[in-house]
Amino acid sequence: MFSEVKVLQIVLVQWLTLFSFTYNSHGTYILDGSAVFNENSYLVLTNTTKHSYGQAFDNTTFEMKDQSFSINFFFAIVPEHKQQGSHGMTFAFSPTRGLPGASSDQYLGLFNKTNNGKTSNHVIAIELDIHKDEEFEDIDDNHVGININGLRSVASASAGYYDDNDGSFKNLSLISGKLMRLSIVYSHPDTKLDVTLCPAEFLVPPRKPLLSLNRDLSQYVLKHMHIGFTASTGSIRALHYMVLVYTYPEAVYQPLEFGRVPTLPPYPKKPSDRLRTVLAVCLTLALFAVFLASGIGFVFYLRHKKVKEVLEEWEIQCGPHRFSYKELFNATKGFKEKQLLGKGGFGQVYKGTLPGSDAEIAVKRTSHDSRQGMSEFLAEISTIGRLRHPNLVRLLGYCKHKENLYLVYDFMPNGSLDKYLNRSNTNENQERLTWEQRFKIIKDVASALLHLHQEWVQVIIHRDIKPANVLIDHDMNARLGDFGLAKLYDQGFDPQTSRVAGTFGYIAPEFLRTGRAVRVKFF
């Protein structure tokens, strides 16, 4: 009935995509890459390693130039995990008995990065592609394509077929695990190539092909070509089954029928996998017992010691986000000493990383009953908590837990300005600021003050500007921070100062005389 019939079967090997088939003679095919014959006379195109490829090309030649032909083969892909395939395979016409230098993964064991797309390849392939590669402009991860000299298909369509009865399109999944038939028919007088996909139980493919290409293939091929298969694996595992049938060298749809469509075996498991499964079950039960005991213990713990985080009246009007104590505890690794950035009369500042992200933060912890602790805490939240400016340290949120108050800021990797200005003997390696950097820092602080005094809806008086409160970010931009002594006023309101606030240091002469500051200085 057929000029030549060759049955292809897969060797079931776990963890990898394998293409295997038996046929009349070992000498019929030339193997390359990972392709080998195993002890059962099966041809395995890929071995048990990831990112491998294999090739099997017929040693005899097939006359294609100015010729018609019809080729059919049956295949099935059984993935290890549902809805996840590998990269796919191709049926190819090649001028040589193999394709040297081919690569795995998206190159399907057919081409490589260098020769992909070159007209000198003289290769025509039908790809069964189950991985969408943007590099090759794939339409999806479940399609059939016609490729000429490269992996960017000249024609492609999602896997499926057109019903002969009503003409509707029926989708097929290439990784469904079901046996399918692919028919390739080329008519030389019409220079038309038709590719049709359908279920294996169809005696004859549907009349309307899935793909059609009106092109004279003689311009791309040599007179004599070799027929073969290529396949590649990536990091996703699956099993690929194929049954290949060569039909007459004519443009006909040859009836093909199985006595019974083969039932594909389930995905295989090695003996070691059974042991691994038993161990996994035992480990799961043990972990479940541990978690159950831990959960019961945690419930009893909560009954005796509850950490309540209830919003107080003053928090309702606050702008920034409230963090839970647990978030800050985990971020700072339990407020460990090695996370400490600095400390003083205000409390301690710790470095941390927010759980679930790479965002670095600085957490300032002060005591609720410390000197001006609560008032400074509220001042920070009510002022900088609602401000967003590139030269102001951003307050991300706050937390109140037991006797302690916490403020969360963006982390400034270069620390405060005073460490650059006051270089001690123990910090002689600290880099010096250039005059350009110093001038930029002055402008940054001025920009922050302009925003506070004139640009925002209210006037904010910082009242404690000093090098220790000017922080430097990773780009050496200055940011003004520590608004614990800040005061809010409405625009146009003239505040009456009753006492000096801030850190002792330089005090303007008018403060000593009147207790009030003026904008203009005379020296």
Swiss-Prot record:
Active site: D464 (proton acceptor)
UniProt subcellular location: Cell membrane
Single annotated GO MF: protein serine kinase activity
Cellular component GO terms held in the UniProt record: plasma membrane
Organism name: Arabidopsis thaliana (Mouse-ear cress)
Domain of life: Eukaryota
InterPro entries on file: ConA-like_dom_sf, Kinase-like_dom_sf, L-type_Lectin-RKs, Legume_lectin_dom, Prot_kinase_dom, Protein_kinase_ATP_BS, Ser/Thr_kinase_AS
One Pfam entry name: Lectin_legB
Annotated region described as Legume-lectin like, given as residue ranges: 28-242
Enzyme Commission designation: 2.7.11.1
Protein name as annotated: Putative L-type lectin-domain containing receptor kinase V.6
Substrates-to-products reaction catalysed: L-seryl-[protein] + ATP = O-phospho-L-seryl-[protein] + ADP + H(+); L-threonyl-[protein] + ATP = O-phospho-L-threonyl-[protein] + ADP + H(+)
Keyword terms: ATP-binding, Cell membrane, Glycoprotein, Kinase, Lectin, Membrane, Nucleotide-binding, Receptor, Serine/threonine-protein kinase, Signal, Transferase, Transmembrane, Transmembrane helix
Matches recorded under PANTHER family: PTHR27007
Glycosylation, residue list: N47, N59, N112, N171
Lineage: Eukaryota, Viridiplantae, Streptophyta, Embryophyta, Tracheophyta
Similarity section: In the C-terminal section; belongs to the protein kinase superfamily. Ser/Thr protein kinase family. In the N-terminal section; belongs to the leguminous lectin family.
Signal peptide: 1-27
Transmembrane portions of the chain: 280-300
Binding sites annotated in the UniProt record for ATP: L341, G342, K343, G344, G345, F346, G347, Q348, V349, K364
PROSITE patterns per UniProt: PROTEIN_KINASE_ATP (PS00107), PROTEIN_KINASE_DOM (PS50011), PROTEIN_KINASE_ST (PS00108)
Stretches assigned to the Extracellular side: 28-279
Membrane topology: Single-pass type I membrane protein
